[in-house]
């Protein structure tokens, strides 16, 4: 099996999970990557050694989980909706932390009002942290990426 096929299989696995099953799955993935994750009501957080917090949400706008995935060239689709918002962000974070031990935040119920993000924002985790930058990996509409505040000179120097 090619390396790329393995990665697509990992993404497919993430796309098929319900939010709470995914939360348990991600907790195990973080532990396997050397983190000590904290599973709280509304979010899953793991402190890293790199001063960046990577954020994605575990819910999707779609009611049903992906059951069948269709491939048309490099495009994935599903009758249930692919769940790319924000399962692709989760997948991207899992790839990034293989090389950089960033802090990680996976939130619940973003699509119904940022419930998990609000709970994290008032938690002790955000107060007792050495985070210089927060990068939320999410999407909006049909574009590949959305960028906000990319003209920060300090961030540009950091990267």
Task: List the predicted regions and their residue ranges.
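General beta-strand structural signal in soluble alpha/beta enzymes
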Residues: 38-40, 54-56, 75-78, 104-106, ...
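Acidic/histidine-rich catalytic neighborhood of metal-dependent amide-processing enzymes
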Residues: 61, 82, 86-159
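Catalytic-core environment of secreted peptidases
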Residues: 46-84
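Short amphipathic alpha-helical segments, especially helix-boundary/capping motifs
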Residues: 2-6, 67-71, 93, 133-139
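General structural feature for long, well-ordered alpha-helical segments within catalytic domains
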Residues: 7, 18-29, 116, 127, ...
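N-terminal hydrophobic or amphipathic helices/low-complexity stretches enriched
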Residues: 1-17
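A non-catalytic alpha/beta surface segment that caps or lines the substrate-entry region
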Residues: 13-50
